[in-house]
Amino acid sequence: MLFERARGVFPGGVNSPARALKHLAAPLVAKGASGPYLYTDRGRLVDYCMAFGAIILGHAHPRVKNAVTQQLERGWIYALLTEEEVAYAERIKAHVPSIEKMRIVNSGTEATMNAVRLARGYTRRDVIIKFDGNFHGSHDYVLVKAGSGAATWGIPTSAGVPQDVIKLTAVVPYNDVDAFVKTVREIGGRLAAVIVEPIAANYGLIIPDREFIKALKEETERVGALLIFDEVVTGFRVGLSGAQGHFGVRPDLTTLGKVVGGGFPIGIFGGRADVMDMVAPSGPVYNAGTYNAHPVSVAAGLAVIEELEKGEPYKIANEAAERLAKGIEDIAGRAGFDVVVKQIASMFQLYFKRGDVKTPQDVRESDEKLYLKLHELAIKHGVYLAPSQYETNFTSAAHTQDVVETTLAALEKAFTELKSQVGK
């Protein structure tokens, strides 16, 4: 069995905890992917994980495949400046005005790690604020009350993070203006930065109040700290200008990843020119990497952005998410379950609970066991949902109306089986 072999060479048998699917007898094994579909050892599945949001056009999109193939024919790494990376960065800058300059790295984790280091170097301060349930990758600065796989596995604060590092990270309830303002005023002139998911997509999906986002900007400006928007998930998914465009708030620094790599490894941190000019070689804040601005990732990312600029991919993906959100609530209600679905743009998540979901505590109060049972039944009927209530579902331009209706029919069967299992 492949999983047994995998456990012999990988911790837990996987290379990222979210792939373990701890509620199943064994993880899914991928065989391939195309359009909205994953091909696995359990058959073809309609994919709503979409590589945790990295894929927005659909799997193996022809335009992306062609761009990557052409780049491979020219060579795949030079460790030199290229015309393509400049054109790519100019495209991003045109759509995200807060990013005046940027550094292209290799992952969301690298992006947020460097953004925090840069904020500390620029302000000459050490303390940062992050929010309960926000996930900013797997580095020491931010692995405190984190989301995503850390929440799924019940280890939001990782072992191995020194207490001296934790002491420099203040954790505040998400979407709580009063708690945030109080904490900023307590820290005052020691605060280097506030890092936040402007739409929290790593603790389920939590859409904050506009007043909360506005307060982040006002309070950081008041004390001379930097505001970092972690848009690794939302960048170029919520729209060409991301969540900051949706809320109309301009952060000092932004991190990007996922969509802008077209399914290949990438991360970006960028923002105000005066802040970014602190990055080596123009300044004293160090960042370097053999694979920075990798030509293949840049080629894929540029192809994705050019497709998104046409508008139609967003229209299809967003309409799919809207239809699924409404359809799932209706199906769950007919089956006798209290379910609320949160949705924005091409992201959605469902929770087994009554009432709204506005905070991480609301997510924790949802019935995780029911979600995991539904997830397993959905696979049985050909649908792959996000593997935990602490993750988010994503649609793509390949999730056409027919695919959505097929999905809803499959989920109706899954909810009917769930009802019989739990005795409703």
From Swiss-Prot:
Its EC number is 5.4.3.8. GO terms for biological process: protoporphyrinogen IX biosynthetic process. CDD domains: OAT_like. The keyword Nucleus does not apply. Pathway: Porphyrin-containing compound metabolism; protoporphyrin-IX biosynthesis; 5-aminolevulinate from L-glutamyl-tRNA(Glu): step 2/2. It catalyses: (S)-4-amino-5-oxopentanoate = 5-aminolevulinate. It is found in: Cytoplasm. InterPro entries: 4pyrrol_synth_GluAld_NH2Trfase (IPR004639), Aminotrans_3 (IPR005814), Aminotrans_3_PPA_site (IPR049704), PyrdxlP-dep_Trfase (IPR015424), PyrdxlP-dep_Trfase_major (IPR015421), PyrdxlP-dep_Trfase_small (IPR015422). The modification N6-(pyridoxal phosphate)lysine is found at residue 258. GO terms for molecular function: glutamate-1-semialdehyde 2,1-aminomutase activity; pyridoxal phosphate binding; transaminase activity. Its cofactor is pyridoxal 5'-phosphate. GO terms for cellular component: cytoplasm. Its main location: cytoplasm. Keywords: Cytoplasm, Isomerase, Porphyrin biosynthesis, Pyridoxal phosphate. HAMAP family: HemL_aminotrans_3. Belongs to the class-III pyridoxal-phosphate-dependent aminotransferase family. HemL subfamily. This is Glutamate-1-semialdehyde 2,1-aminomutase. It comes from Pyrobaculum islandicum (strain DSM 4184 / JCM 9189 / GEO3).
